[in-house]
Amino acid sequence: MSVSAIFGTGIVTVAASPVLRQFQVPKLGNGGGLGMVIECSSRPQKKSTAHHRKTRPKKTQPWDIKRKPTVYAPLPPLPAEWSPFTLASDDGGAATAAGDLVSGAA
């Protein structure tokens, strides 16, 4: 049973005799007979990204702090079928349409 379940429930008392009435637990709230009401949590749970950033390993060693990103060799040139091309024709409209298709503006 969680702590919020214990404090969020009302306390049942038996008021059969005047002797028991003096030992009743005073009710809190606006007189509606509610027990203690939990309004908000003082330590809310972090969302997943905030938790990941908070709990990830920290760089504490000088060699790790000063470490640079890995330098990779440059990629080879693209094959001919992946290269952009232009149409060499007298019709300016067809060349413009082909240029739009290659650039992805269409």
UniProtKB/Swiss-Prot annotation:
Name of a matching Pfam family: DUF5323
UniProt record, GO biological process: translation
GO MF term set: mRNA binding; rRNA binding; structural constituent of ribosome
GO cellular component entries: chloroplast; plastid; ribonucleoprotein complex; ribosome
Residue ranges of the region described as Disordered: 42-70
Keyword entries, A-Z: Chloroplast, Plastid, Ribonucleoprotein, Ribosomal protein, Transit peptide
Positions with biased composition (Basic residues): 44-59
Transit peptide residues according to the UniProt entry: 1-39
Keyword Signal: no
Localization (cell): Plastid, Chloroplast
Family, per entry: Belongs to the chloroplast-specific ribosomal protein cL38 family.
Subunit structure: Part of the 50S ribosomal subunit.
Protein's recorded name: Large ribosomal subunit protein cL38
Organism of this sequence: Arabidopsis thaliana
Gene for this chain: PSRP6
